[in-house]
């Protein structure tokens, strides 16, 4: 089997198996030699921002000269993106080698009457092998869905657990209230392991604090009052960070979104708490933050063109806060799509009310969760936007939106799938 065949096979896995309890994943890890053991792991859960927090942590560890692994999801263009070693995607050879070992163990387990690991479980198992064989010292690991029952939660003794902002997403799996969702995310907390969490919402924060107390885990709430913005421009944000009793740090990030201050601060606070483990000076940590590379998070993909992966109500609210800042001085064009299981009516209403875009192009992501471009366009019209058109094909939609942009700004938003498709399209377009 070659790399392409392996990827094709992995993509078929959801058609013939289901998610399994953690014991199933633990058994397969054991059969693979428990590759996760001996790696210093930071475990990150949350609804929004967990990928960014992972990227900030990875950037700071790299700045400090550490050999790192980064496990995140979803991928935007190529599946290899889910596994990074020292900031670079793993090679096709590393990917295939890990897949063959995992698939061999899975087939043997199946022969004993057990189920094949799910899509995400397969990738998690592959990741643990990839990082062990690469000899990484630190692994920054993002949960797939939720926390308590996530495959990543089989890791028994991480260095720290981080929980980012909580919002209503995947409610059919995680519960309908913020507190219920927070309870699922807090399931990653391990006895005695420090937990650092976004404390900006009292309900979820109280659930996380209670779980930490139950587990005997030191709890470090990250309050919005710990950071203060100094400047915001197209180049990024500068801000100060100081926890009570701590000295003030001057930080800079190459992102325009205000919400990234919380994500960067969560990561910086975690590295402060783990100072005795990594021994990286604070000025080096700050330098690492400033050099982060994490695609499609308010990313300037071309002059005046920003791609953002916001794909639920809270994410869109944060997006609107940032885009609204630029709308004061620029004519705004929106390229938008969403999938059917998101609250896209509310997302569209938020965009129209908060930004009042001059132009809107609606497009669609084909597949089982498709929302036709014309349906989205009609929602924009009902929400009060006037210059709205529908273009189902993403490349053509981008060109149409770019044509409407003029000297203003174009924001592409609504779905991580859209972000990935646009990244692939722009790579081809720009040669």
Regions picked out by a protein language model, each given a short descriptive name:
Residues 397-427:
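A glycine-rich beta-strand to alpha-helix segment
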Residues 201-216, 304-305, 348-409:
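C-terminal helical cap/extension that packs against the catalytic core
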Residues 1-46, 53-66, 71, 107-115:
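Short functional linear segments
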Residues 110, 135-142, 158-250, 264, ...:
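Acidic, Mg2+-coordinating active-site environments of NTP-dependent enzymes
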Residues 29, 34-37, 63-156, 172, ...:
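ATP-dependent carboxylate-amine ligase catalytic core
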Residues 134-137, 329, 385, 406-407:
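Short, high-confidence coil segments that cap the C-terminus of an alpha-helix
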Residues 198-199, 213-233, 253-258, 285-291, ...:
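Beta-strand->loop->alpha-helix junctions that form or flank phosphate-binding loops
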Residues 38, 138-143, 149-162, 166-170, ...:
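Nucleotide phosphate-binding/pyrophosphate-handling subdomain across enzymes
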């Amino acid at each position: 089997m070659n790399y392409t065949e392996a990827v094709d096979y992995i993509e078929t896995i959801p058609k013939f198996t289901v998610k399994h309890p953690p014991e199933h994943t633990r058994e397969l890890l054991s059969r693979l030699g428990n590759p996760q053991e001996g790696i210093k792991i930071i475990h990150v859960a949350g609804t929004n921002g967990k990928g960014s927090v992972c990227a900030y942590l990875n950037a700071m560890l790299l700045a400090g000269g550490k050999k790192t692994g980064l496990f995140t999801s979803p991928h935007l263009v190529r599946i290899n993106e889910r596994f990074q070693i020292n900031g670079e995607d793993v090679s096709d050879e590393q990917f295939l080698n890990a897949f063959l070992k995992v698939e061999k163990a899975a087939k043997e387990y199946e022969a004993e009457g057990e189920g094949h690991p799910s899509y995400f479980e397969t990738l998690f198992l592959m990741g643990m092998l990839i990082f062990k064989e690469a000899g990484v010292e630190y692994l920054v690991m993002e949960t797939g869905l939720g926390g308590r029952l996530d495959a990543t939660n089989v890791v028994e003794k991480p260095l720290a657990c981080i929980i980012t902002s909580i919002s209503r997403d995947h409610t059919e799996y995680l519960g309908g209230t913020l507190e219920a969702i927070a309870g699922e995310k807090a399931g990653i907390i391990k006895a005695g392991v420090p937990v650092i969490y976004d404390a900006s919402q009292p309900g979820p924060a109280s659930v996380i604090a209670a779980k930490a107390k139950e587990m005997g885990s030191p709890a470090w709430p990250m309050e919005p009052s710990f950071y203060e913005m100094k400047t915001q421009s197209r180049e990024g944000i500068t801000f100060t960070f100081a926890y009570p009793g701590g000295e003030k740090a001057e930080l800079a990030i190459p992102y325009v979104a205000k919400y990234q201050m919380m994500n960067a601060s969560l990561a910086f606070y975690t590295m402060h708490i783990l100072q005795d483990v990594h021994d990286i000076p604070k000025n080096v940590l700050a330098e690492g933050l400033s050099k982060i590379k994490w695609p499609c998070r308010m990313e300037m993909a071309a002059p005046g063109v920003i791609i953002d992966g916001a794909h639920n109500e809270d994410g869109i609210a944060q997006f609107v806060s940032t885009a609204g800042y630029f709308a004061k001085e620029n004519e705004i064009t929106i390229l938008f799509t969403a999938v059917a299981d998101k609250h896209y009516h509310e997302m569209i209403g938020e965009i129209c009310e908060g930004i009042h875009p001059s132009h809107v192009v609606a497009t669609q992501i084909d597949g089982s969760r498709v929302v036709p471009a014309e349906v989205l366009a009609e929602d924009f019209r009902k929400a009060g936007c006037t210059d709205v058109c529908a273009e189902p094909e993403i490349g053509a939609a981008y060109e149409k939106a770019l044509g409407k942009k003029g000297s203003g700004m174009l924001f592409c938003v609504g779905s991580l799938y859209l972000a990935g498709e646009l990244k692939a399209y722009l790579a081809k377009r720009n040669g």
